[in-house]
């Protein structure tokens, strides 16, 4: 791991959670990492560890984090960090997470689960959208999403959390 580059960043919030006991029993120990834009840019300045997957979230109208090196699996999505209902967001054209994007996350997770050893979640500040997606996956996989909510570092976006968790539960596989 690139601790020398990771820990020198001011805005790095880096927590690791093991997914679930069932996966550990199968030997599928997946590490979860939550980080901000600056941290992922720094991390991607050298090759990722093998079997790394990344979900990268950008604000509407912004570019994605620049990755010099890419992980083995990458999902990039654009949606704003607003905790409001779909109807209000659509009416105001605020570009919040859609159900289709939640389904993309669920499909990506189900595709990399059992293959990826590291799953990184990244958004602008590494505390709301990325934390919400990580919490939803942890809740789905191990009923341990509360670990993210209990942290003083994160403030998961509840709309994102509920959409991703619902998509994971509804998607076969």
Show where each model-derived region lies:
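Cysteine-dependent PTP/DSP-like catalytic domain, specifically the C-terminal lobe
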Residues: 135, 143-173
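Short, Lys/Arg-enriched N-terminal segments with co-localized hydrophobic residues
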Residues: 5-29
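Helix-loop module immediately N-terminal to the HCX5R catalytic loop
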Residues: 83-119
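Recognition helices and adjacent regulatory flanks at domain boundaries
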Residues: 103, 107, 113, 124-127, ...
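Glycine-rich, flexible N-terminal cofactor/catalytic loop recognition
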Residues: 30-77
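Acidic, aromatic-enriched beta-alpha/helix-loop junctions
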Residues: 72-83, 95
């Amino acid at each position: 791991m690139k601790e020398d580059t990771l820990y020198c960043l001011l805005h790095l919030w880096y927590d690791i959670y093991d997914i679930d006991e069932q996966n550990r029993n199968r030997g599928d120990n997946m590490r979860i990492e939550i980080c901000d834009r600056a941290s992922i840019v720094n991390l991607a300045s050298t090759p990722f560890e093998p079997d790394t997957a990344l979900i990268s979230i950008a604000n509407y109208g912004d570019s994605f984090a620049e990755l010099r090196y890419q992980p083995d699996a990458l999902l990039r999505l654009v949606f704003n960090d607003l905790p409001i209902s779909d109807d209000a967001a659509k009416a105001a054209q605020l570009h919040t997470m859609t159900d289709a994007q939640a389904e993309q996350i669920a499909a990506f997770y189900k595709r990399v689960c059992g293959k990826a050893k590291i799953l990184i979640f990244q958004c602008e500040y590494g505390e709301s959208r990325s934390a919400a997606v990580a919490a939803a996956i942890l809740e789905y996989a191990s009923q341990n999403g509360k670990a993210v909510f209990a942290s003083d570092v994160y403030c998961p976006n509840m709309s994102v959390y509920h959409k991703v968790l619902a998509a994971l539960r509804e998607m076969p596989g």
